[in-house]
Every structure is written in C-alpha cells, then in structure tokens.
Amino acid sequence: MQQAAVEQNAEAFVIGGYVRDLMLKRLNKDIDIVTSGDGPALANRTAELLNVKRVSIFANFGTAHFVYKGSEVEFVSARKESYRATSRKPDVEKGSLEDDQMRRDFTVNAMALSLQEDSFGELVDPFNGLLDLENKILRTPLEPAITYSDDPLRMMRAVRFASQLNFTIEEKSLHAIKENAARLEIVSVERTMVEFNKILLSKKPSVGMKLLFDTELLHQFFPEMVKLHGVEKRNNNAHK
C-alpha cells in the first residue's frame, strides 16, 4: 500500500475503527484507508501488488473495497462533507486529511496512522481521540449538535459504542442527542434497526437500553416498548 501511494505521489493513512480497536487491543477486520490521492486508483494498484483479483468500485461514493486475508479493506479519498436538512446523504468534495477526520462521528474514530515511509505508524490525532479513548469518553470532533443533526444515525452509534465499549457519552454530546432525537425520522428503519440489534447483542445491552430511553431515541423507532415503561407484573397480572 505504501508503494502504491508513492507511485501515485499521494499519502495514505489507516483511519477510524481499526485504529481505535488497535489501541484497545480488540480484533477488527474492517480496515479503512484514506488517501490524499484517488481512493479507487490506490485500491486497484494495491490489489495488483497484493495479487488480489477482485476490487469493488463504488464510483458514486468515490470508494473502493477488496478482501485480503479475511480483512475487509476500504479505500476513500480524503473529503469534506456538507448535509441538507432532509437527508443524511452528504454532498462531497475533495479535502485534506484533517477535513476527513473532522467529518468522523467521534474523536476516538478520527485517529489516523501514517503509512508513509518517513512517518510510518505515526499517530495523527488533531481532536485528542487517544485521550478520550484512555478516559472512555465519546465526544464528537465538531459541535455535537452539528454532528448529530447532519447524520442522525450517529446518535444510535453513540449509544451502541457506549454499550459495546462501556464508554460514557460526554455531557454536551448527550444533551445534543436528546435535542436532536426527532431527527432520527430521516434515517431508514433498516439502518436504525441494524444499530439497535448491535446494542442488544453487546455485553451490556441494559446500558444501551437505558440511554435509548433517557435520550428519547427509543420513542422515535420503538414507541410500543416505551409504553411498557412502568408496567409491573404481579401474580401473572400486569399493572400500570
């Protein structure tokens, strides 16, 4: 990958969840690569060098993907994103590494590791994600109200990570989730349920369920469950 980037006169970095889990010593087979050059072109050349036969190109998103030794490797060009109020699908334009880190959901997912020969393995962490990781804090790179309003699915992801990793959602961020809970309506039910299922499958689903209730996210996609709050069962009879 380093060789492919040099050939294209570009820089490449590992970014996101793989870096986070590497620091936490957790297994992660999803590897995200961001480049200052052309993401699909870097993917194609890297695949050639690794003798990978199949590369999936997603031209509309400017991304590419292949599987190597059981790991899913995705390539994307560094970019900026802007959102419209009615959609969580962003308008995209070319950007810098820091622009790309800024668009990430949480500081712990915005850390990057350099793949350049002269700085290989160097951590690029403009938002102090490593400190938040050590303190088990979920914080957004941008103002949380902007982060969650732009892409409301990130609110579900915040709860999921809190439940999976036993992290605490930073107070300002938690308040922004409560304020923006109704924005979840622009997210498809399918995407919301994927995150909900991951919360239920986490080690401490009770943590996630309490957060979903307290932030009123649960009210948006599962109001029937909210109505059960306060129901007691005595002698096989339910009481409200």
Task: Give names to the regions the model predicted.
Residues 1-240:
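Catalytic cores of the polymerase beta-like nucleotidyltransferase superfamily
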